[in-house]
């Protein structure tokens, strides 16, 4: 059986992947503020295939509570409208030629608290993913030390580096959550 390799860089990359995934998930959460990433999960039927909004239109934010969608192909305007209406965002598109405007309504206090709970759920999933990566790294180190490939001192030193990488990733996750929570609760 092959001896597993320990690569701290790989562990850090995998932890960073969990942080990036969290940022993407939180970016799609609706706040009272207009952001182009709000439309990222929406798929538009275009040319016989399902495409992300970014591949058929440009999304801009002319005002804090308004999204402006410039559809590149005039024939796609109704498809983009339909995709927005059928999404679970609860937004009502207003069309003016090839431009679709979306007014983002203010969220009430109860809805804000629900969004914060969802953000916490996503954050906990990211923390768990980071802890799994840490466990994998520590398991590899223990196996290497047990097999005599590294000394006990090296195992302890590298385990400390894995723990530091874990702490850094968790701190970054907490920072992302705090920022999103502030954005959601801002009236």
Swiss-Prot record:
The keyword Transmembrane helix does not apply. PANTHER family: MITOCHONDRIAL RIBOSOME RECYCLING FACTOR PSEUDO 1 (PTHR20982:SF3), RIBOSOME RECYCLING FACTOR (PTHR20982). GO terms for molecular function: ribosomal large subunit binding. Signal peptide: none annotated. It is found in: Cytoplasm. InterPro entries: Ribosome_recyc_fac, Ribosome_recyc_fac_dom, RRF_sf. GO terms for biological process: cytoplasmic translational termination. Belongs to the RRF family. Responsible for the release of ribosomes from messenger RNA at the termination of protein biosynthesis. May increase the efficiency of translation by recycling ribosomes from one round of translation to another. It comes from Methylorubrum populi (strain ATCC BAA-705 / NCIMB 13946 / BJ001). This is Ribosome-recycling factor. The gene is frr. Keywords: Cytoplasm, Protein biosynthesis. Its main location: cytoplasm. The keyword Transmembrane does not apply. GO terms for cellular component: cytosol.
